[in-house]
Amino acid sequence: MNNNDLLYEVALGKDSELIIITYAIKYSNCDFIHAVQVKPFIRSNYTKIFESKKLNNFVDIGYYDNPIIKTYGFTKKKELAELYKEKYEKLIKFAYYDNLISDKIETIDYYKTKEFELKKEIATINAKINSFN
């Protein structure tokens, strides 16, 4: 890939054993492609976090065992790609908090509050995303 193809690539938030990877690729017929995968972060395999390859107008960022969330989308608007990026950053935190709650940790009320706040923020982002349609 040359510099014109790769617009951005970000590995975000290693909260405990979770990681989110977001990136956008520029193609001649589609300005932005946004791909996200959230998965358990396998420390023993950290040197090969993901593989990428172009498939027509799509980006395949590989597959992992038991992904928590796996979704792909594409847009010609950078603002929309950024909204999706923000949404999935929040979803990874939500999954992390939900995991802690299911483990019945002592600070369960704190994490339930955090989950509630994230749900509201995600709903706001979804409304912005829907306004593009």
Q: Residue ranges of each PLM-predicted region?
A:
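Extended alpha-helical coiled-coil "stalk/arm" regions
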Residues: I101-N126
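Short coil-to-beta transition motif at edge beta-strands of beta-rich domains
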Residues: M1-I19
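Short beta-strand-centered aromatic/proline hotspots
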Residues: E17-N29
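Amphipathic alpha-helical interface segments
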Residues: V10-D15, I25, D60-I61
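Short, solvent-exposed secondary-structure boundary/capping segments
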Residues: C30-V38
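Short, solvent-exposed coil/turn segments at beta-strand boundaries
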Residues: M1-N3, K26-D31
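Short intrinsically disordered terminal tails
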Residues: M1-N3, A127-N133
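Intrinsically disordered, low-complexity, charged/polar segments
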Residues: K39-I105, Y110
